[in-house]
Amino acid sequence: MQVIVALAALSSLAAPALGFSIPRGVPVSQSMIDVKLSAAGNSMVKATITNNGDRALNLLKFHTIMDSNPTRKVTIESQDGKEVQFTGMMPRYKHTDLKPTYFISLPPKGTVEHSFDIASTHDLSRGGKFTLKAEGMVPLAEENGTTITGAAKYNSNELHMDIDGNKAASVERAMGIVKRSGPLTRIGKRTSIDMQSCSNRQELQALTAALRASAQLSSMAAQAVQQNQEKYMEYFKDPQYAQTVQSRFQSVAQESSSTSGGGTTYHCTDLMNGCEQGVLAYTLPSQNEVFNCPIYYSDLPPLSNECHAQDQATTTLHELTHNPAVQEPFCEDNGYGYERATALSAEKAVQNADSYALFANGKFLPMSSMLVTQD
């Protein structure tokens, strides 16, 4: 099925141009790329991406069918119509300073293939018949460029696979079970911090401050859902979801703060080897585990003064929305950055992690002066 290139407008509210920004005034183009899924083995899938246009494109791999990380590339339904549990990672990538290695170049009429084993990120041990489909959005740059100039929505064909459960069960999981040898410290009986991973005092202080700021931002955002309808509609589109959005913000505030028991574990460092280039932090939703990466500390301020920019507080908020222990169903990465997040339908926005992080950051810039100081 073909992909329609969607070119969204820049926000008049955002101070800087983010790495995924799409310039205002660029018209909607013709269908330019095609994504086709095909079976390549028992649980192996091949995605073929074709550039139907007359000019070369640079396609950003992050959060797309081409992502080299074990992210959710397809939705999988079993024969009874139930979605198969995802056991991979949900990373938050840095928006800025995009490197050429983050892109795949596709010449006019050219194709690129990307294969992945769905058994490495899904429990297919029951075996049987499954239906797969991929949809998302690919940020685009010009040939040899790294400046995002557009984005292509894609909806693949449906792929039907008959999978041998025993063979699928023998495939090594991309992200194993988290093992801890050290103690856990619960912040006010909420999010547990894995102290074994937090031997660096500065990293522990930064994470503790980010959790406190996340609690404050989320609490204020929950109030603003009802108090500022214009802002709510900008991000979430439909008033019928206001209670759901407010409830999720309240749940994140509770998980981040000091009231009663919570269900996530937060790690200062990467124990599962998920911190590839460009990854700020990531979540394993099947285990309710969150991990910070080195650039979370080196490249992000505690809380940004710039509208819709990334920082430690809203990155932590973003990651907590990915955890089913915070609220179910947990959030996906349906649209990344302001332009892509605000272009989502209401149904997609209410389940999009960045919509919550951007709403909190974009609405509450005065919070930068209220950020809890590090201990």
UniProtKB/Swiss-Prot annotation:
Its main location: secreted. Keywords: Cleavage on pair of basic residues, Disulfide bond, Hydrolase, Metal-binding, Metalloprotease, Protease, Secreted, Signal, Virulence, Zinc, Zymogen. GO terms for molecular function: metal ion binding; metalloendopeptidase activity. It is found in: Secreted. Residues 1-19 form the signal peptide. Binds 1 zinc ion per subunit. It comes from the Eukaryota. It holds the Pfam family Peptidase_M35. GO terms for cellular component: extracellular region. Zn(2+) binds at H318, H322, D333. Its cofactor is Zn(2+). One of its GO terms (biological process) is proteolysis. The keyword Zinc applies. The active site is at E319. Disulfide bonds join C198-C268, C275-C293. The keyword Isomerase does not apply. It catalyses: Preferential cleavage of bonds with hydrophobic residues in P1'. Also 3-Asn-|-Gln-4 and 8-Gly-|-Ser-9 bonds in insulin B chain. Belongs to the peptidase M35 family. Secreted metalloproteinase that allows assimilation of proteinaceous substrates. Shows high activities on basic nuclear substrates such as histone and protamine. May be involved in virulence. This is Neutral protease 2 homolog MGYG_00813. The lineage of its organism: Eukaryota, Fungi, Dikarya, Ascomycota, Pezizomycotina.
